[in-house]
């Protein structure tokens, strides 16, 4: 009998493994990306204090004003730009990238590249 692969469980296992080494500090907070089927979310987190410094998602008003979809690469680029802009307003210029167990490809890579182009260093 063929068993179906539980992709979410595999992703969560990878995410736990990566989180052992990726930790956000006050100097370099963590840029965490979460991808769902229709939306994408990004947060800049200081893990020492347990505080979220900046957020952006495809559900934000600024994103919806641009009339983009969150489930594609163009939308992910816009989310990357938004989170970088909001992080810089809070005085954050360097971050550690947390891909959340996802493969660095497609929407995850688009968020990272757009954040780099907007001025975040990682």
Curated annotation (Swiss-Prot):
SUPFAM superfamilies, A to Z: Translational machinery components
GO biological-process terms attached to the record: translation
Gene Ontology CC terms: cytosolic large ribosomal subunit
Example of a GO MF term: 5S rRNA binding
Pfam families listed in its UniProt record: Ribosomal_L18p
UniProt-listed InterPro entries: Ribosomal_uL18_bac-type, Ribosomal_uL18_bac/euk
Function: This is one of the proteins that bind and probably mediate the attachment of the 5S RNA into the large ribosomal subunit, where it forms part of the central protuberance.
Subunit annotation: Part of the 50S ribosomal subunit; part of the 5S rRNA/L5/L18/L25 subcomplex. Contacts the 5S and 23S rRNAs.
UniProt record similarity statement: Belongs to the universal ribosomal protein uL18 family.
Protein name in UniProt: Large ribosomal subunit protein uL18
Lineage of producing organism: Bacteria, Bacillati, Bacillota, Clostridia, Eubacteriales
